[in-house]
Curated annotation (Swiss-Prot):
Pfam families from the UniProt entry: RraA-like
GO biological process, any: regulation of RNA metabolic process
Quaternary structure and interacting proteins, as annotated: Homotrimer.
Annotated source species: Paraburkholderia phytofirmans (strain DSM 17436 / LMG 22146 / PsJN) (Burkholderia phytofirmans)
Record EC number: 4.1.3.17, 4.1.1.112
InterPro entries recorded: RraA, RraA/RraA-like, RraA/RraA-like_sf
Cofactor note: Divalent metal cation.
Binding residues annotated for a divalent metal cation, in chain numbering: 103
Catalysed reaction, written as an equation: 4-hydroxy-4-methyl-2-oxoglutarate = 2 pyruvate; oxaloacetate + H(+) = pyruvate + CO2
Function summary: Catalyzes the aldol cleavage of 4-hydroxy-4-methyl-2-oxoglutarate (HMG) into 2 molecules of pyruvate. Also contains a secondary oxaloacetate (OAA) decarboxylase activity due to the common pyruvate enolate transition state formed following C-C bond cleavage in the retro-aldol and decarboxylation reactions.
Needed cofactors: a divalent metal cation
Record-given protein name: Putative 4-hydroxy-4-methyl-2-oxoglutarate aldolase
């Protein structure tokens, strides 16, 4: 599916006004070959621990988007080249991460969309802490499981339902 978030905002100004379509703050950068991605949100809330990220990406993605509230930590990465390849193999459409990625050159080779704050060479811990399928606070919007995410180079949108 090809789209532009700018066009979606223009076409759905009524939903923007109602709050059923929300724009995340412009702090996310794309780190993959994919120019745009969208899908139903699966949410995680973790902090500097990516064990739950891996466990989730090991499941069939079925075109969904993994939305991770990593607390905005810039101290370590929660997604790198191996997890991006795993996401691609299992059919995930994308990842939106309020935190860091690493292995940026490897991420540029995958077709799974990845939007994150920045990079960090340090890996996250693997303690297995965190929560799944909860509402998460990302810069600019609350994201609930089952909502829809649309992302491209211009930004990341969250919609209460799939957009036409």
């Amino acid at each position: 599916m090809s789209f532009a978030t700018a066009d979606l905002c223009d076409a759905h100004e009524d939903q923007l006004a109602l709050g059923t379509l929300r724009v995340l703050e412009p702090v996310f950068h794309l780190f993959s070959r994919a120019e745009c991605f969208s899908g139903e949100a699966v949410t995680l809330k973790v902090f500097e621990d990516n064990a739950l990220v891996r466990a989730t990406l090991e499941e069939k993605g079925a075109g969904r988007v993994l939305v991770i509230d990593g607390g905005g930590s810039l101290r370590c990465a929660l997604v790198g080249g191996n997890l991006a390849q795993l996401a691609e193999q299992n059919g995930w459409a994308g990842i939106v991460l309020n935190g860091c990625v690493r292995d940026a050159l490897e991420l540029n080779e995958v077709n799974v969309g990845i939007a994150a704050l920045t990079t960090s060479p340090r890996r996250g811990q693997k303690l297995g802490t965190g929560e799944r399928d909860v509402a998460v606070h990302l810069p600019g919007a609350l994201v609930r499981p089952g909502e829809w995410v649309y992302a491209d180079i211009d930004g990341v949108l969250v919609a209460s339902a799939a957009l036409n």
